[in-house]
């Protein structure tokens, strides 16, 4: 269910400060964050944000199609390695 339009988009203040600081300094290093719940704003376009997935920080390069989505959508938390193979089928 989307957030109410009356409330507006959410972004953590500490992440917003990091983004503004990176934009004014022109720094291209990835910004490390644990804030998966923050919405991607238009001023983040062109930055690389390292989003924590529970184990490591996944680098996410922000493009214009990502605006309005959450950072956590681009850093998957679960790895699927496939189901166990059938041992009977391998013997044949």
UniProtKB/Swiss-Prot annotation:
Short name of any one Pfam family annotated for the protein: Ribosomal_S19
An example Gene Ontology biological process: translation
Entry-linked NCBIfam families: rpsS_bact (TIGR01050)
Protein family according to the UniProt entry: Belongs to the universal ribosomal protein uS19 family.
InterPro entries, per database record: Ribosomal_uS19, Ribosomal_uS19_bac-type, Ribosomal_uS19_CS, Ribosomal_uS19_SF
Keyword RNA-binding (UniProt): yes
Keywords: Ribonucleoprotein, Ribosomal protein, RNA-binding, rRNA-binding
GO molecular function, one term: structural constituent of ribosome
Protein name: Small ribosomal subunit protein uS19
Xref: SUPFAM superfamilies: Ribosomal protein S19
Membrane spanning residue stretches: none
Matching HAMAP family: Ribosomal_uS19
Recorded coiled-coil stretches: none
Keyword rRNA-binding in record: yes
Listed GO CC annotations: cytoplasm; small ribosomal subunit
Protein task: Protein S19 forms a complex with S13 that binds strongly to the 16S ribosomal RNA.
Top-rank taxon: Bacteria
